[in-house]
């Protein structure tokens, strides 16, 4: 089989691989591609948004999922007319639905802009200020921690060891008096 040539799906002519890993001149051929998992890279700015499930991480499950029954309830024995109850339900639901849409139409884009700027600033400060300060602090504190450790081992360890030996000889007996 060595010395044979074949054409792959892309129309390239090359010799039959003489190794299990594939042809060294084209290492990512089909036999190797099955062995090596390839990661597909996606740009975060071009991802598609889901117009049906707009809360995929369930951020607002407990907070703003308010229905008519969560706000208005009539206890047993105190009921209004059925027509009033149905009209109240419809009024509440439709008002909440359309007023939310109106507010999101008026304020959604400006607030998205403000929150985008805020989180961009927050990310920038975290990446370029907070993390470097913490890393710098940890590097500087290592020197102090070594000196502190030497002082503890030099002065405190013998003192506490001596106190431990003194108190290790104390014996207590408990007697129950009747």
From Swiss-Prot:
Record PTM Phosphoserine, positions in chain: 2
Keyword annotations of the record: Acetylation, Cell membrane, Golgi apparatus, Isopeptide bond, Lipoprotein, Membrane, Palmitate, Phosphoprotein, Ubl conjugation
KW Lipoprotein (keyword) present: yes
Signal peptide interval: none
InterPro entries reported for this sequence: Caveolin, Caveolin_CS
Residues covered by region (Interaction with CAVIN3): 82-94
Topology within the bilayer: Peripheral membrane protein
Ranges for region Interacts with SPRY1, SPRY2, SPRY3 and SPRY4: 131-142, 167-178
Lipidation (S-palmitoyl cysteine): 133, 143, 156
Post-translational modification Phosphotyrosine, affected residues: 6, 14, 25
GO terms for cellular component: caveola; cytoplasmic vesicle; endosome; Golgi apparatus; Golgi membrane; membrane raft; perinuclear region of cytoplasm
Cross-link Glycyl lysine isopeptide (Lys-Gly) (interchain with G-Cter in ubiquitin): where in chain: 5, 26, 30, 39, 47, 57
Span list, region Required for homooligomerization: 2-94
PTM (free text): Phosphorylated at Tyr-14 by ABL1 in response to oxidative stress.
Chain intervals for the UniProt region annotation (Interacts with SPRY1, SPRY2, and SPRY4): 149-160
Cell cycle among keywords: no
Compartment(s) where it occurs, according to its Swiss-Prot or TrEMBL record: Golgi apparatus membrane; Cell membrane; Membrane, Caveola; Membrane raft
Intramembrane-annotated stretches: 105-125
Residues where N6-acetyllysine is found: 5
Any one GO molecular function term: molecular adaptor activity
Subunit structure: Homooligomer. Interacts with GLIPR2. Interacts with NOSTRIN. Interacts with SNAP25 and STX1A. Interacts (via the N-terminus) with DPP4; the interaction is direct. Interacts with CTNNB1, CDH1 and JUP. Interacts with PACSIN2; this interaction induces membrane tubulation. Interacts with SLC7A9. Interacts with BMX and BTK. Interacts with TGFBR1. Interacts with CAVIN3 (via leucine-zipper domain) in a cholesterol-sensitive manner. Interacts with CAVIN1. Interacts with EHD2 in a cholesterol-dependent manner.
Function field: May act as a scaffolding protein within caveolar membranes. Forms a stable heterooligomeric complex with CAV2 that targets to lipid rafts and drives caveolae formation. Mediates the recruitment of CAVIN proteins (CAVIN1/2/3/4) to the caveolae. Interacts directly with G-protein alpha subunits and can functionally regulate their activity. Involved in the costimulatory signal essential for T-cell receptor (TCR)-mediated T-cell activation. Its binding to DPP4 induces T-cell proliferation and NF-kappa-B activation in a T-cell receptor/CD3-dependent manner.
Family the entry assigns: Belongs to the caveolin family.
PANTHER family, per the entry: CAVEOLIN (PTHR10844), CAVEOLIN-1 (PTHR10844:SF18)
Designated name of the protein: Caveolin-1
